[in-house]
Curated annotation (Swiss-Prot):
Swiss-Prot/TrEMBL keywords: Cytoplasm, Ribosome biogenesis
Lineage, highest ranks first: Bacteria, Pseudomonadati, Pseudomonadota, Alphaproteobacteria, Rickettsiales
Protein name as catalogued: Ribosome maturation factor RimP
Function text: Required for maturation of 30S ribosomal subunits.
Keyword Cytoplasm: yes
GO cellular component terms given for this protein: cytosol
GO terms under biological process: ribosomal small subunit assembly; translation
Record flagged with keyword Cytoplasm: yes
Intrachain disulfide bonds: none
Organism expressing this protein natively: Rickettsia rickettsii (strain Sheila Smith)
Domain of life: Bacteria
Length: 161
């Protein structure tokens, strides 16, 4: 059985893609009322504006009203995934090659559960990281969560835009 987050993903992802957005994450916060938080990113590597979030929110709201997946009252929050966005799909690692990432694992690998390094490559369900002077191979299924890291290099590129 799919979680409510997976069901929401299934009904909104295609519409967001058609609008030029990647659906990054669907998450519930709070209790009464529930808050449905949806993080989006641009498919063409442009910044996500407030107007983009508003358009996406209207589309998502209409779909959720029709699909009626959420029984109780809720608030909808649509936001940019941000500079230190989560990497939740295997494909994300290829999109962000050469970027710094923090990874938390579900279990120990070489005596550690946390790694930070540059993504060298991602293939065959494996992530290759350059951590300091060594290369670390991480099985994608071991990853609990991962986020991009805002480095000085990335920050300088943003200032030039």
């Amino acid at each position: 059985m799919q979680t409510i987050e997976q069901q929401i993903t299934n009904v909104i992802e295609e519409s967001l893609t058609d609008m030029g957005f990647e659906l990054v994450l669907v998450k519930f916060k709070g209790v009464n009322p529930k808050v449905v938080e949806i993080l989006i990113d641009s498919l063409n590597s442009e910044k996500v504006s407030v107007e983009d979030c508003t358009k996406a929110s209207r589309t998502i709201s209409a779909i959720l009203d029709v699909e009626d997946l959420i029984e109780a009252a809720y608030s909808l929050e649509v936001a940019s995934s941000g500079l230190e966005r989560p990497l939740v799909k295997f494909e994300n690692y290829n999109r962000f090659l050469e970027r710094e990432v923090k990874i938390k694992l579900k279990e120990l690998l070489n005596g550690k559960t946390r790694y930070q390094g540059k993504i060298i490559k991602a293939e065959n369900n494996k992530i290759y990281l350059k951590c300091e002077e060594q290369e670390v191979l991480i099985d994608y299924d071991l990853i609990k969560n991962a986020n991009l890291v805002l480095t000085e290099e990335v920050f300088k590129k943003l200032l030039k835009q």
